[in-house]
């Protein structure tokens, strides 16, 4: 598989671990608690959002640190969220759904839902 070929680890969810309609934070929390190592920052890239670069992630983490934020999200130049989420571990370890200390970075990522979005 692509992940195997590129040395990317996969966290498989048990069938009854989460439901399709669960909030994204629930899914991310499940993944975080199934890691063997505790991280201070967790980066989530949605598979249907190509175009985000490692430099965007670095910029987001630096923005988080500089402004003492708990969450940074990526937005395109059109102001639409584009699948890049950078979370402080406190967000995943708490019962909060969203952060009160949120920032954003502009990236070239784009969220794809339909064929027309590829154009």
Give residue spans per PLM region.
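Conserved N-terminal catalytic core of the sugar/cofactor nucleotidyltransferase
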Residues: 1-38
């Amino acid at each position: 598989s692509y992940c195997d070929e590129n040395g990317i680890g996969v966290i498989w969810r048990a069938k009854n671990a989460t439901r399709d309609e669960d909030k994204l934070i629930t899914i991310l929390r499940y993944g975080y608690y199934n890691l063997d190592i505790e991280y201070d920052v967790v980066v989530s890239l949605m598979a249907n959002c190509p175009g985000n670069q490692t430099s965007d992630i670095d910029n987001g983490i630096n923005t988080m640190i500089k402004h003492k934020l708990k969450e940074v999200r990526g937005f395109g130049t059109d102001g639409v969220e584009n699948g890049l989420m950078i979370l402080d571990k406190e967000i995943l370890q708490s019962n909060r759904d969203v952060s009160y200390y949120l920032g954003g970075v502009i990236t070239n990522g784009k969220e794809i839902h339909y064929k027309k979005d590829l154009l």
